[in-house]
C-alpha cells in the first residue's frame, strides 16, 4: 500500500506519505479507513510507486499520468459523482511483481 498527499493548487507532484507491504500495508489501509480517506486499489501502481519511490519524496514523473487519473476520479467521487473506476495504465518499464522484479512481457 502507498499513501499519497496532494494539495490542489499547490506546486509539485504528489508526495509519498507512507508505504509498506504485508502487515504495514494493512495498517496503512486500516488507518485510511479510520480517517475516511478514499482508497483506490491498483496493485500494479502500488508496486510501481513502492519500488521507485521514497517516503517524503514526490512520485516519479513517469507515474504522473497514472496518479493524475486516480486523483481526478477521487476528487469527482468526493463531490458526489458516480463514476466507473478507471483503468490505470502503468508504463511497462515500471511494472513489477510483488517482489520488485520487473515484469516480463509475454
Predicted segment positions?
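Divalent-cation
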Residues: 1-106
